[in-house]
Curated annotation (Swiss-Prot):
Keywords in alphabetical order: Cell membrane, Membrane, NAD, Quinone, Translocase, Transmembrane, Transmembrane helix
Spans through the membrane: 1-21, 26-46, 54-74, 89-109, 142-162
Position of the signal peptide: none
Coiled-coil stretches: none
Compartments it resides in: Cell membrane
Function: NDH-1 shuttles electrons from NADH, via FMN and iron-sulfur (Fe-S) centers, to quinones in the respiratory chain. Couples the redox reaction to proton translocation (for every two electrons transferred, four hydrogen ions are translocated across the cytoplasmic membrane), and thus conserves the redox energy in a proton gradient.
Gene Ontology molecular function, alphabetical: NADH dehydrogenase (ubiquinone) activity; quinone binding
One Gene Ontology cellular component: plasma membrane
Catalytic EC class: translocase
UniProt entry tagged with the keyword Transmembrane helix: yes
Family: Belongs to the complex I subunit 6 family.
Protein's recorded name: NADH-quinone oxidoreductase subunit J
Lineage, highest ranks first: Bacteria, Pseudomonadati, Pseudomonadota, Alphaproteobacteria, Rickettsiales
Subcellular location, principal: membrane
Amino acid sequence: MPIFFYLFATLITISSVCVVLSKNSVYSVLWLIFAFINGAGLMILLGAEFLAMMLIVIYVGAVAVLFLFVIMMLDMHFNKTITQLKANLALSIFIALIMFADLVIIILLGTKNINFNSNVSFTITNNISNTKAIGGVLYTDFMLPFQMAGLILFVAMIACITLTLKKREGVKRQDISKQLRHNKENTVLMTKPILNKGVENIKYE
């Protein structure tokens, strides 16, 4: 069992690094799918088959595939993105150094000073399935973090929608409120043209 743990953990680490370093967003999503699959393998080793199935069905089958289609449909200019990243290179390096320092501190100090909540029990027996045990802990002891996670996902969904709202020049769009305000006084114009002459000085909206 330890050899499988180290195998899945190593593959997750490699795929996570490739997600960040890949220049093509499509390749990043494919590496992310690979990381989710290895994460499901770790869940199986822990005896949580339900979580492993949810990782495959929801994250790989729905979320990651949705990311893939959204990236493929968006008109993303990679050269422009690289230019923007170079403009914020100093800030990016500073944040990366802070995160790296946090990881070093955690590795050196370990988890000795972390007080775990001993009141939270997560026991799986023959009478209680892992689905029931996870649901009992998730919706009782961790109800507030669960709601916050849902709120974060909701904000991320709104952000994905706003990415598709690009204003393009020369594209005519419908103004529903303006159409509903129209009546016969401002849409129908009665005129009497002169014989053999066209109608001039008419403004169209």
